[in-house]
Each structure stands twice: as C-alpha cells, then as structure tokens.
Amino acid sequence: MHHLGRRIFLAGLALAGLSFRSAFAQADNVAGRVDEVIGLVTVQGKDREKALMLQETVFIGDTVATGSASKLGMHLGKETLLRLGELARIKIDRFLVNAGGTIELNAGPLLLDKPKNTGPISIRSPFGLVSVRGTRLFVGPSKGVFGVFVVNGAVTVTAAGKTVTVAEGFGTDIARRGAQPTTPARWGEERIRLALASVS
C-alpha cells in the first residue's frame, strides 16, 4: 500500500507538471483579448473552432472571421487595437507583446491603431504587404479596390515589386491581385468616412 500511494503521489506530481507547462506554453501563445463582438465572429485554432465571445483570448496561429453585418474589436497585447468589419478574415501568424508581429488579412476591412513605442507589425494580404510602425490605418476593400489609408503616422506598401510610402492623410490603391500600388494621394472625405465606418 505504501508503494502504491507513492506511485499515485508521483503520478500526481507528473500531471501537475504537465498542467503547469501547458499553462505556461498557452500564456506564451496569447496574442490578445476580445473587447467587442457584434453579430457572428468565429475563431479557428489548433484545438478549437467556435463562436468568439467578449473577453475571450485569441492565440497566435488563430484564424478569426466575421460574418455578414458583424464586427470585432480586440487588443493585440496591451496597447495595439485591431478592428475588423464584416466578412473579414485574418490569421495571427506571429505576435509578441511590444515586439510586433505578422497578420494575414485574407478578406474584408481592418483598422489597426498601434502606438509608436511598440514593435513593427506586417499585414500580409493577397494584394501586397503593409509594414506598420506607430500608426493608425485602414486596410481593405474601398471603392472597388484594395485600399490602404493612413489616419496618422506612415506606412510602406509593397506589391508586384513596387514599394510606396504612405504618409498621414494619404492613401494608396491596389486595383487587383498582382497590380502595383498607386502613387499615394489624398482620399476624399466621403471615402475616408465610408472606410472607417466599415470597421467601427
């Protein structure tokens, strides 16, 4: 009985160790937390596929999608705000708190608001690459094209071998997959309003 009790005790310690290691590993993979959900928002990850709820955690490697007439607001880390409009789909490829990361934007509109004191974030899409530092910007469908508009700060946009720098108050368009970004230009007030309304 003494030996049996000792084996049970050791097995319990081993399981506890696994649980602690699992908890630490999961904490290392945390990308952010959900602040707002309107309509249907789903998350698909390594071990889950479900509707995403308020205050839930989103992990590195998760794919998050919004349905029709649906929107999402979440924080990446503590300071970077991410908003998705309807019919959007992103995958958080890599993210370290205050060190930046990579997001795949596969569909729909996205708004990113990132302080200057956090690391750079890359937004990859089928249309091109947007490199973000301390910036608030819109990325996604606008006036029938893929648009990038900088509310404040500056970004670089690379597509089809061409890179442009987009300054505050300017935007660039990519007409289709495989096309180059246009020379940055000021967007009209109505276009800006519609773009920002799609993610707020």
Predicted regions and their residues:
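N-terminal secretory signal peptides and thylakoid transit peptides that target proteins
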Residues: 1-21
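Flexible, surface-exposed loop/linker segments and immediately adjacent secondary-structure boundaries
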Residues: 23-63, 67-200
